[in-house]
Amino acid sequence: MITIKIGGSIVDSLHPSAIPDIKKAAAGGVVLVHGGGKEVTKVCEQLGKEPRFVTSPGNIKSRYTDKETAEIFTMVMSGRINKCIVRMLQQHGVNAVGLSGIDGGLIRAERKSRLVIVNERGRKQAIEGGYTGRITSVNSELLETLLGKGIVPVVSPIAMGNEYELLNVDGDRAAANIAGATKSERILFVTDVDGLMMDEKLVSRLSAAEAEEIRPKIGPGMEKKVLAATEALKMGVREAIIARGSRENPVSAAIAHENCTVIGDG
């Protein structure tokens, strides 16, 4: 059993062998979670909605999501991107079903009442939390029902709040929670780089403790993946892998630990 997170920006640059490779992995059970932040930003701009990003004191950059942005986020992620991926899988004979975290109460989250950010002056500032959520539960029974019928769930990271509102949750961390809930053996983050780079060199392996230690020294995009990786390990996932999606057979190569970053104590 493997949970695969694919960054929305690399869907179009996946190697032609990627989908057939996912089909092979599906025999053992696959849940696919996708991102799509760049596409959301593009559509926001097309609709005249200026995207806003904030940075936490821990140097994590994220989208500030007001109600209108949450609606655009849902439209793009659960519509355009999700269905594009499902179509690609179906085209290669994979019985895939597209879901958002709203469907079947798949991902529940608690709406953040406030966010602490670092403002333009470099000072901490508390702002209204908007429509951003902290994941509280995953409906693993729904996923297991689909997996038991040989179906590949394709999940967009939109969560349902306590008041049934749409909430934006981080895709990497949503994948980590899904991996933990489904007792996945591993989680794979498919990206546009070979893995974690330090001093221009690929880090091939890290223990969970080493990953926690170096996380503050990593750039914002990769830092989120390392954070999600360590969270997945704490939830019982055996290993987390960060690998490039544009290489041949990216899933099989990552599982074989070829030219990627593996995080875990195994």
Swiss-Prot record:
Swiss-Prot/TrEMBL keywords: Amino-acid biosynthesis, Arginine biosynthesis, ATP-binding, Cytoplasm, Kinase, Lysine biosynthesis, Nucleotide-binding, Transferase
One record GO biological process: lysine biosynthetic process via aminoadipic acid
Domain of life: Archaea
Species assigned in the record: Cenarchaeum symbiosum (strain A)
Key word Heme present: no
Enzyme category, top tier: transferase
Disulphide-bonded residues: none
Protein name per UniProt: Putative [LysW]-aminoadipate/[LysW]-glutamate kinase
Keyword Acetylation listed: no
Described function: Involved in both the arginine and lysine biosynthetic pathways. Phosphorylates the LysW-bound precursors glutamate (for arginine biosynthesis), respectively alpha-aminoadipate (for lysine biosynthesis).
Family: Belongs to the acetylglutamate kinase family. LysZ subfamily.
InterPro entries listed in its UniProt record: AceGlu_kinase-like_sf, AcgluKinase_fam, Asp/Glu/Uridylate_kinase, LysZ
